[in-house]
Amino acid sequence: MSSPAFRFRLATLDDAPALLSIYAPYVEKAAISFEYDVPSLDEFRRRIADISRKYPYLVAEDENGQLLGYAYTHTFIAREAYDHCAESTIYLALDARKHGLGKRFYRAIEELSLAQNIYNLYACIGEPQGADDEYLTDNSIRFHEHMGFRRIGVFTRSGYKFGRWYNMSWAEKLLMEHPEHPEPVIPFPQLDKALVADILRRSAE
């Protein structure tokens, strides 16, 4: 089997400038992110560090070292009973879309989540205001359906951006049958490093 055109690895704080440049268009020119302002570099570094304390924060890197996108899981709701759930986030460079990268990111995220004893993944997805919405399409909704997520609810007109209201759709994917007595969630940094490396390698193929 030939080597993949990119590899997955864990994000570092040094990746923050490149990742912020990937994220910025989704803030400034789209309603995919509901942030109004692009966060500062220091704030973005803080987010990477905070998420990485418990969850995987992944980047995709091509053969030239250019970052193509990033993905992570993070806290769903900050109460102990929700610990076996996580919310997923993926952002791709604009020219890296439509090449199967998002699907491979989810392949990695799902397997790493199971290794952590996380069984439910949730995605929070903005809904476009009709087919002619220049700030948002239904691509993310259709992508998550393709990945096995099921739409379970909608927050009606809960987001206001670019002078219009947006619905926020929630989608869910159950990764396995829930055990009657689940093992505690394992913080991502405590996972076996060889296992993580193997998952990242296989997911990029």
Each language-model region and where it sits:
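C-terminal "cap" of GNAT-fold acetyltransferases
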Residues: 157-205
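Conserved acetyl-CoA-binding loop-helix of GNAT-fold acetyltransferases
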Residues: 98-115, 137-142
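A short beta-loop-alpha structural element at the N-terminal edge
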Residues: 7-19
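A short, internal acetyl-CoA/4′-phosphopantetheine-binding micro-motif in the GNAT/acyltransferase core
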Residues: 89-98, 125-130
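Acetyl-CoA-dependent GNAT
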Residues: 38-85, 89-95, 107, 112, ...
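Conserved catalytic-core motifs of GNAT/GCN5-like acyltransferases
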Residues: 72, 124-126, 141, 145-164, ...
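Conserved GNAT acetyl-CoA-binding A-motif
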Residues: 113-136
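Conserved GNAT-fold acetyl-CoA-binding loop/helix
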Residues: 20-47
